[in-house]
Amino acid sequence: MTLQTFKSTDFEVFTVDGLEERMSAIKTNIHPKLEALGEQFAAYLSKQTDENFFYHVAKHARRKVNPPNDTWVAFSTNKRGYKMLPHFQIGLWGTHAFIYFGLIYECPQKVETAHAFLEHINDLKTNIPNDFVWSIDHTKPSVKLHKTLETNDLQKMIERLATVKKAELLVGIHISPEEFSAMTNEQFLAKIESTMQSLLPLYALCNR
């Protein structure tokens, strides 16, 4: 049986008012799909890397007043968490689905990873697909399209990862609700797989 992924109507969960109400809608409608994606792609990443990957569905446990504007499942090699490690994500905002690889501010490997990325910056500029996007803050939906960046722009983002304590850097794709409505489950799963394939060389640079 084909894994049931998101529907275009799932984006509407972020229009539900109130913390408890929105969290209830996320837990009912989104979390089961994130769990299923987590199982499938933790196994996929484990096979691709010969490492044990674990998945972590966002719980939003720290939220006491404001409801979440996005939700996700993350993949790392630590069974207890992902924020301290380079990791992959699949998730939703109200405006798009996303598939990312990156490092957020809690990760202690940021300086070493930034140096590795800088050493291979020309490869990154050339080999990352033009329709991929870069994010410097996982809590905001705004991104920069890879094809619009000069090598110098990319260099500045990577250098910031090394020099700014709260800096983050994620790269991957966005899929709009309109694009999503035209995709089958199989096409979405294939898109996740192809995106992760394009991002695995960056993961390898983090672990050289």
UniProtKB/Swiss-Prot annotation:
Pfam name, any one: DUF1054
Source superkingdom: Bacteria
InterPro entries: UPF0637 (IPR009403), UPF0637_domain_sf (IPR053707)
HAMAP family: UPF0637
Family: Belongs to the UPF0637 family.
Protein name listed in UniProt: UPF0637 protein BCAH187_A4079
